[in-house]
Amino acid sequence: MNQCKVMNDGYLEKRSNGLLQLWKKKRCVLSDEGLRLYGCKGDSGKEMRFEQMTTLDCVEYKRGLVYFTIVMNDGKEVDFRCQQEGTAWNAEIALALVRFKNRVAVQTGRNRHLSHLGSCGEGDVEL
């Protein structure tokens, strides 16, 4: 996610995939291309790109925490939670995902339109 616009930077807790499914605090950077997760050891981070995401759902509010799930294209679900007060991470991620998908749809539509125009010669008449 180089040269991307950073929309939010802060902390979320991610549920681990292990047997105990412990919650681990991650520093998260939300950009216009996706979400990058960093562990406490300052590693290079794990990238969750919007092009690999299907949706954000299962938003639940319990005891001052917001729980939500990001569903990936392969069906994998990644669970997160954060404090209810402060930044609404779930809403920011969902809006950024919608913006990304809209941008891709507009670009796809433009490409189809330009491709269609290129296939019709200037003298051609469409019926």
UniProtKB/Swiss-Prot annotation:
Keyword Membrane tagged: yes
GO biological process: intrinsic apoptotic signaling pathway in response to DNA damage by p53 class mediator; negative regulation of phosphatidylinositol 3-kinase/protein kinase B signal transduction; positive regulation of apoptotic process
GO CC list: cytoplasm; plasma membrane
Primary role: p53/tp53-regulated repressor of Akt/akt1 signaling. Represses akt1 by preventing akt1-binding to membrane lipids, thereby inhibiting akt1 translocation to the cellular membrane and activation. Contributes to p53/tp53-dependent apoptosis by repressing akt1 activity. Its direct transcription regulation by p53/tp53 may explain how p53/tp53 can negatively regulate akt1. May act as a tumor suppressor.
Keywords assigned: Apoptosis, Cytoplasm, Membrane, Tumor suppressor
Family: Belongs to the PHLDA3 family.
UniProt KW Cytoplasm keyword: yes
Domain PH: 5-108
Protein's recorded name: Pleckstrin homology-like domain family A member 3
Organism the protein comes from: Danio rerio
InterPro entries: PH-like_dom_sf, PH_domain, PHLA1/2/3
Domain comment (free text): The PH domain binds phosphoinositides with a broad specificity. It competes with the PH domain of akt1 and directly interferes with akt1 binding to phosphatidylinositol 4,5-bisphosphate (PIP2) and phosphatidylinositol 3,4,5-trisphosphate (PIP3), preventing akt1 association to membrane lipids and subsequent activation of akt1 signaling.
Topology with respect to the bilayer: Peripheral membrane protein
GO MF terms, alphabetically ordered: phosphatidylinositol-3,4,5-trisphosphate binding; phosphatidylinositol-3,4-bisphosphate binding; phosphatidylinositol-3,5-bisphosphate binding; phosphatidylinositol-3-phosphate binding; phosphatidylinositol-4,5-bisphosphate binding; phosphatidylinositol-5-phosphate binding
Localization per Swiss-Prot or TrEMBL: Cytoplasm; Membrane
